[in-house]
């Protein structure tokens, strides 16, 4: 049996209870060593075989899983954040399907949630943004034409940009290209969200590249953009005295 497990954004106590239990029971752990906090490996039982997938190809990962299966062991494939975002899990699952190896998936706290926590911010504010775009800048891995960053920026919605801090000049240019964001639209760079060395750099779209360089951030960071980082928003209807819900009768006058 193979368990795909989300390790969470960084802090070891942010893994789910289920994920921690699966780690503690595993006979084999294959973890994404470039981003997963190694402190989580302290949950492994004595004798557990541990492999760093940052040093492996897909074929080597699969061969390691097959060997563990042949020995009757349980494998945890430990991915950073939540495996569903940029986790490259589909190709692994398809190979396991072809081999007849059973697997399941345990979600984790994504780094985009960790970034919001670091900012003490809410991505979806009434009359500001009700949409969150999660994307990346095109690099060695292409993106579909319709999902080019400049085209997505035209929406002006809250945007969280993964895997792109090394292309921050191109990111800045793309964000301004369509006019969806103003030069003074608030932005932030969150380095290693929830880790002890977490760093938050607040800026604007215009100053994004310069502030990133000034703070020496070159990797392991998210870029967040949008007016949700500003001061203006409307009160939520959910807790408005005049708003009737399944659990509470509202008043017309709001008194």
Task: Describe the residue ranges of each PLM region.
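Non-catalytic, surface-exposed connector residues within folded enzymatic/regulatory domains
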Residues: 16-17, 34, 126-128, 184, ...
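Short secondary-structure boundary/capping segments
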Residues: 20, 42, 67, 124-125, ...
């Amino acid at each position: 049996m193979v368990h795909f497990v989300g390790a969470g954004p960084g802090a070891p106590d942010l893994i789910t209870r289920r994920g921690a239990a699966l780690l503690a029971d595993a006979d084999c752990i294959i973890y994404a060593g470039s981003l997963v906090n190694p402190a989580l490996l302290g949950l492994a039982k004595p004798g557990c075989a541990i492999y760093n997938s940052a040093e492996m190809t897909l074929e080597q990962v699969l061969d390691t899983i097959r060997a563990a299966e042949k020995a009757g062991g349980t494998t945890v494939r430990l991915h950073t954040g939540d495996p569903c975002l940029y986790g490259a899990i589909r190709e692994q699952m398809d190979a396991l399907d072809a081999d007849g190896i059973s697997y399941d998936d345990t979600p984790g706290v994504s780094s985009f949630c960790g970034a919001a926590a670091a900012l003490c911010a809410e991505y979806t504010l009434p009359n500001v943004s009700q949409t969150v775009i999660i994307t990346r800048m095109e690099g060695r891995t292409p993106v579909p034409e319709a999902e080019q960053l400049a085209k997505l920026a035209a929406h002006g919605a809250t945007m969280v940009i993964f895997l792109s801090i090394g292309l921050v000049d191109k990111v800045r240019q793309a964000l301004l290209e369509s006019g969806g964001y103003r030069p003074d639209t608030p932005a932030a760079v969150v380095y290693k969200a929830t880790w002890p060395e977490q760093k938050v750099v607040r800026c604007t779209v215009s100053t994004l590249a310069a502030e990133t360089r000034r703070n020496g951030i070159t990797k392991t960071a998210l870029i967040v953009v949008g007016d949700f980082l500003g001061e203006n928003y409307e009160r939520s209807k959910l807790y408005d005295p005049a708003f009737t819900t399944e659990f509470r009768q509202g008043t017309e006058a709001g008194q």
